């Protein structure tokens, strides 16, 4: 029986061996009485040589007409050839056309197409080599996170997506009818993770989060994947240490396993290699001083948006923290700084090269009365948070957590010009199809 192989397995060591290969036509070039088909699968590309005197007139004519993304199965002999991709090619003896394609809607070089065309045909675009590489890197970053979390004693939990209240502000909730009442799509699993720490102490989850923000920036999606951690007995400084160790492992492990894919997007890997903890830390006050010294029109108490973060990232060649934010610009659940009631014990991790925030974290408010007051100050209904307040009634402890935006991390690692390319099917205010 002829052995079925993947493209990445066609190497000079198989010289003289008969193999069977299934995939899609990437390019089709005729030179005299030979046709050179580049066939791709999920692992790479192989050159298949179709010679008229071997396959016959009928098969040769079929091969001539195969357009890009035609699906085929070929059988043939592996021949070592340093000119071929991977140093070997397949000399075809049999060609089976599963489906012939005459014209593919996406150019051979997708970068020549407009972003709108690529997004309209996203269901086809994701099969192109660079789009596939992005998904492989994303998958590997998550795999690396799981490795580190398992090794460090964290428990994975599975929180709900349908919720009754806001975590990050009511204005950004997606509302939907839930039988005879209303529910919302989750903005974050955080509150449910906080409940889980009283039994499991260190927990994490990977879920989609939804934000009804009409932000049209290169780093916002309305649906994104959220890697969130929560731990009992940790303060802000403890959880920042967890963040940097986790991110460092994710990036280094992905560099180890996906260097080829990363090099499709980055010529220089220095910045990614430079992720050994500890990461630099600056206070919000210091960040304001840096921005003002660079002529940015910002005052103490202002939130730091994409433009301000971009300026700050110019000061660092690796991820770094900004901590100690003003209370009024942060979420209700963050613990007040006991040394300065104007601030909360919160931090953001910013990626260099202009990418900005990839993680938001904080120590959580563990005092019942203070948390209730913050809920009321935000104009929210305490009834929606009765169960959450219960966590402060029965054995409350100091605890902290954070959320990592997976697509933001992918965008930085691969130096993408827009976060939408890090999502399989991106959701933005302007796009819900396909």
UniProtKB/Swiss-Prot annotation:
Family annotation (SUPFAM superfamilies): Class II aaRS and biotin synthetases, Nucleic acid-binding proteins
Listed CDD domains: AsxRS_core, PhAsnRS_like_N
Main location: cytoplasm
GO biological process: asparaginyl-tRNA aminoacylation
Record's subcellular location: Cytoplasm
Primary gene name: asnS
Protein name as annotated: Asparagine--tRNA ligase
Keyword ATP-binding: yes
EC annotation from Swiss-Prot or TrEMBL: 6.1.1.22
Reactions it catalyzes: tRNA(Asn) + L-asparagine + ATP = L-asparaginyl-tRNA(Asn) + AMP + diphosphate + H(+)
Record-linked InterPro entries: Aa-tRNA-synt_II, aa-tRNA-synth_II, aa-tRNA-synth_II/BPL/LPL, Asn-tRNA-ligase, Asp/Asn-tRNA-synth_IIb, NA-bd_OB-fold, NA-bd_OB_tRNA
PROSITE patterns: AA_TRNA_LIGASE_II (PS50862)
Keywords assigned by UniProt, alphabetized: Aminoacyl-tRNA synthetase, ATP-binding, Cytoplasm, Ligase, Nucleotide-binding, Protein biosynthesis
Domain of life according to the entry: Archaea
Top-level EC class as recorded in UniProt: ligase
Similarity annotation: Belongs to the class-II aminoacyl-tRNA synthetase family.
Molecular function GO labels: asparagine-tRNA ligase activity; ATP binding; nucleic acid binding
Any one GO CC term of the record: cytoplasm
Native organism taxonomy: Archaea, Methanobacteriati, Methanobacteriota, Thermococci, Thermococcales
